């Protein structure tokens, strides 16, 4: 189980990313339209002005049940070991255990 403070920090990053999403997108569109290099540098400065935690690359996918940030399956939103436990308990329809 992940610490609650880390999960809250991740939620805060998600809120910041949503808040500054339009600013980032509009400035990136401006960069593609502008031809002069000096204007591009000004827009790059605007792009760096939002907080670092508002960047989408700083977000992690976390397991819904444990909050684990690693080994997540996008289809289920679960970490690997929780997914395995749920498959063994027949809680995920259509998922089969592998055996060799």
Swiss-Prot record:
Gene3D superfamilies: 1.10.287.1480. The gene is rps14. GO terms for cellular component: chloroplast; ribonucleoprotein complex; ribosome. GO terms for molecular function: rRNA binding; structural constituent of ribosome. Keywords: Chloroplast, Plastid, Ribonucleoprotein, Ribosomal protein, RNA-binding, rRNA-binding. Belongs to the universal ribosomal protein uS14 family. SUPFAM superfamilies: Glucocorticoid receptor-like (DNA-binding domain). GO terms for biological process: translation. This is Small ribosomal subunit protein uS14c. It is found in: Plastid, Chloroplast. Its main location: plastid. Binds 16S rRNA, required for the assembly of 30S particles. Transmembrane segments: none annotated. InterPro entries: Ribosomal_uS14 (IPR001209), Ribosomal_uS14_bac/plastid (IPR023036), Ribosomal_uS14_CS (IPR018271). Part of the 30S ribosomal subunit. It holds the Pfam family Ribosomal_S14. NCBIfam families: PRK08881.1 (NF006477). It comes from the Eukaryota. It comes from Helianthus annuus (Common sunflower).
